[in-house]
């Protein structure tokens, strides 16, 4: 009798994706983050669903409803903090996943990479709108500042902003639509993740060496299922430690003050995972220029495959490119730090230099270094 998992139409899809999938035998723990992102998404959708059962998207009651969830709902505090810190874990995994792709040349799978960039944009949009929902001070002013950036678009800018607001300022209409979008987007992200996997399974996984691994493939199950479970356990350990010991570590104290349009907080800043992009935005003294730099800071990832000048795929055997990669990581950490600092000397100049270096590394220095390494090997 033929095996059901190989013949049943639904089981066959699962089998070919997670059980009998031919996988390179040498992929390291850096390849765990795809499954971790899947787990993060599931956790976010489930906790978000339970939060939505008690949340009200009205300016008068939004803040109170979140307080009610934390105080009166059974384990509401746990659900709320799992959701808030789950977002942080999501972004940590995302950044590591993208970093892995850059280091090992996974971006050479064009379709997979481009869907990934689209996913990054979608997750960032979802997180931004979710941050607005508790209707604290930072929620309100963050929404005001970021949506206002669209007014920099020539000709249609101011009309566009009022259209998004649903009025002349961030108000009830804005909150209601942000809640609607925040609810629907994770399901769109899940669908996109399915397409991401579909394209990945067309080519098969990359591996640390960047070489073709067709001659040495092993089944995904049990080897990588057990490896993924280890990663998932570590993720759960870190997330629960964060939630149970210091749930507000990554949050902003200002968000425990109800939104007040008449009182601006001294330092408006987004969640930590947006600080690098926020620093790039602030480093340009022109509004439109800043908005373009902000968008390009993520969109530049889509250009990376076309700037690959090396004869080798991975950075595993390219020491000079490795140095530049780690400089890029340090630069992003610097930008993250600057994004949380006030706009004053010396932070302004540090932010501007770090922003220039960010684009310079990706667009100029890395491709030139790759060409230099080709000559070094006399290829």
Swiss-Prot record:
Signal peptide: none annotated. A ubiquinone binds at residue 201. One of its GO terms (molecular function) is metal ion binding. Keywords: Electron transport, Heme, Iron, Membrane, Metal-binding, Mitochondrion, Mitochondrion inner membrane, Respiratory chain, Transmembrane, Transmembrane helix, Transport, Ubiquinone. GO terms for cellular component: mitochondrial inner membrane; respiratory chain complex III. It is found in: Mitochondrion inner membrane. Component of the ubiquinol-cytochrome c reductase complex (complex III or cytochrome b-c1 complex) that is part of the mitochondrial respiratory chain. The b-c1 complex mediates electron transfer from ubiquinol to cytochrome c. Contributes to the generation of a proton gradient across the mitochondrial membrane that is then used for ATP synthesis. Heme 1 (or BL or b562) is low-potential and absorbs at about 562 nm, and heme 2 (or BH or b566) is high-potential and absorbs at about 566 nm. This is Cytochrome b.
């Amino acid at each position: 009798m033929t095996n059901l998992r190989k013949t049943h139409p639904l089981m066959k899809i699962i089998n070919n994706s997670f059980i009998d999938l031919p996988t390179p035998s040498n992929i390291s723990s850096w390849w765990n983050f795809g499954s971790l992102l899947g787990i993060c998404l599931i956790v976010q959708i489930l906790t978000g669903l339970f939060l939505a059962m008690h949340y009200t998207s009205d300016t008068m009651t939004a803040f109170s409803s979140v307080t009610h969830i934390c105080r009166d709902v059974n384990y509401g505090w746990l659900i709320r903090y799992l959701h808030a810190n789950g977002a942080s874990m999501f972004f940590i995994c995302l950044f590591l996943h993208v970093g892995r792709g850059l280091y090992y040349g996974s971006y050479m799978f064009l379709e997979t990479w481009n869907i990934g960039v689209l996913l990054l944009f979608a997750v960032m949009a979802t997180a931004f709108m979710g941050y607005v929902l508790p209707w604290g001070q930072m929620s309100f002013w963050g929404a005001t500042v970021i949506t206002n950036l669209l007014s920099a678009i020539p000709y249609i800018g101011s009309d566009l902003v009022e259209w998004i607001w649903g009025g002349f300022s961030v108000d009830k209409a804005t909150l209601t639509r942000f809640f609607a979008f925040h609810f629907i987007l994770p399901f769109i992200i899940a669908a996109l993740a399915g397409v991401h996997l579909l394209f990945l399974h067309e080519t098969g996984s990359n591996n640390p060496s960047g070489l073709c691994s067709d001659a040495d493939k092993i089944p995904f199950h049990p080897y990588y299922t057990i490896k993924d479970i280890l990663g998932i356990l570590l993720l759960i350990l870190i997330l629960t430690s964060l939630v149970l010991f210091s749930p507000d570590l990554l949050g902003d104290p200002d968000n425990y003050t109800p939104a007040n349009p008449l009182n601006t907080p001294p330092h408006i800043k987004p969640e930590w995972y947006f600080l690098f992009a926020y620093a790039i935005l602030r480093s340009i003294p022109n509004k439109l220029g800043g908005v373009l730099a902000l968008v390009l800071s993520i969109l530049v990832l889509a250009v990376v495959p076309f700037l690959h000048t090396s004869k080798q795929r991975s950075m595993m055997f390219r020491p000079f490119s490795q140095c530049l990669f780690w400089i890029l990581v340090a630069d992003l950490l610097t930008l993250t730090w600057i994004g949380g600092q006030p706009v004053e000397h010396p932070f302004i100049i540090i932010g501007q230099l770090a922003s220039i270096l960010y684009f310079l590394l990706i667009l100029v220095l890395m491709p030139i270094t790759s060409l230099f390494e080709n000559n070094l090997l006399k290829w």
